[in-house]
């Protein structure tokens, strides 16, 4: 069975007006929860006409790129870099690298102090997006559900003197104790056919899908990786915040949390493993303490992120699977008694078919 064709639609970032649909090859894409997705594609340049079209349509930092698989949108983002290549035969190609919509927020700073007191953390995120969009040239059409709430209120002040990047402070807000997950999804509205950039929020995590998919090895799972990593483990933690000194003539020292210790793990015989983190823009002791507690909780028993490579002609998968639950069943020499567990999909990388290579998806999982 033939896989649906991939195509790249280039649009104006601010208006989403289509600029061109160029022929592409060697497409790859990935998307994640908690991390900016990436995509790349090569535009073959066999003649002057195609080269002129590519030059006119692709203006890095100003152009939006949508990747379609058949009738569906599978990825959206912004091309930030490109590489023009010529081989020994003089064959030209333009390799485009793009970051997901959230990468735009790496290029937006808080230049006017923003303050929230007793505000739901989802509203703080939406307020930051509204602030970003309110400035001239800053609206790229990110949509959201204004009624969605997390039930957790926060006090936050983002000072213009710190010039923090918008994505950085959203990530900090998400990763604090009692935080949330967020991403900006891409899809086509089923009614109007309009391309959508949608803010997706979930507290404490993003969950999607009503029915789980079963993946077996041997079976649709072609291969897997199961990383085991103790380098990020810690049972003692301390975090540093902003300086609490307002006197420029005196020595400036950062605010510090109390030393957090997992006594139960040390009593169980574990060696002491120290961990630290820096939050140089955090000025409130309670906020810094919440960051430290969240960091220790993640480091005491770090979760492995298994990776499964799945044949897409054996099981229907798409980027809409992010946040969904899958049931993984593996039987081999390591899992001699058989593994049968449920996991949540937190990342997905697609490799389209290429020169006899089947179309595959690599799933990144965490315990459900």
Positions of predicted regions on the chain:
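Short beta-strand and beta-hairpin "edge-sheet" elements
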Residues: 66-98, 328-361
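Extended non-globular C-terminal regions
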Residues: 196-198, 321-322, 349, 355-364, ...
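Residues that flank catalytic or metal-binding motifs in active/ligand-binding sites
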Residues: 75, 94, 178, 195, ...
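Charged- and aromatic-enriched interaction segments used to assemble
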Residues: 99-229
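A structural detector for beta-sheet-dominated domains
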Residues: 9-11, 30, 42-44, 68-70, ...
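Acidic, small/polar-enriched beta strand-loop surface segments
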Residues: 4-7, 14, 201-353
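Beta-strand-rich assembly/attachment modules of structural machines
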Residues: 1-122
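Oligomerization/assembly interface segments of phage tail-like spikes and tubes
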Residues: 30-50, 92-103, 173, 239, ...
